[in-house]
C-alpha cells in the first residue's frame, strides 16, 4: 500500500462523507471516488481506506440494531426456528458477495481508480432507486392487508446478488439491496433491517481480506484510517437514524434524481478534465 497517506483533514472529510452516504442510497464508495478525484487526493490506500471506514459504519449498524442482533444471538443459542431461519437467510445472502469479492478483487480495486466508471455506475443506481416508486407502495399495501412479504431463500439470494453488484464504486449497497427486497415484497422496515444486517457480514469479510495490507502501511496511513473511521462512525449513526425514518415515509425513489445529477456532472467533469 504505497503513497503518502491521508492528512488528518482529508481523512476527516472522507470519513464524514462515508458515514453520511453509507446509509442513504447514494453510494458512499462513489462519493469517496468523486471527492478524491476532484480534490486530487492520491495515495489514500484505495480499497483499504474504503473498507476501514466501512467497518466504522458497520459498528453504527451494530449499535442501531443492537436489540435485534441480541435477540438473534439468543434465538440461535436456544435454537428458536425463526432466529435460525433468519440467520440462515443472512448466510445465504452473503454468498454472492463472497464469490464476487474473491474472484474479482483485482478488477474491483481498479474501478476505484476509474472515475468514469463511477459516474456511469451512479446513473445505474438512479435507475435502481427509481423502481421503488412502484414497488415500495405495493409492499406497504400488502403489509396493511396482513400479507407481508416472506423472507425465503429466493429473496435472500436475490438481495445477496444486489449486494454483490454494489461492491463496485457508484452502486449503492443500501439502495440496491433495499430496492430488490421491496420488489420481492418485503415491507420497508423489514427490507432495511435485512439489508443492513446482511451488510455486517459482508463488510466484516471485506475487512478480513484487507488486514494483511496493514502490514505495509506507514504510521501516517494508519493515522488516516483511525481519523476517518472515527468520523464515519459518528456520521453513520446520525444518517442511519434519518434513513430509516425517510424509508418509512415512502420517498425512497426521490434519491434517484440526486444520483442522476451527481453521476451526470461527474461524468462531464471526467470528460472535460480527462478524469
Region spans (language model):
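Multi-pass membrane proteins that catalyze or facilitate reactions on polyprenyl-/lipid-phosphate substrates
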Residues: 1-275
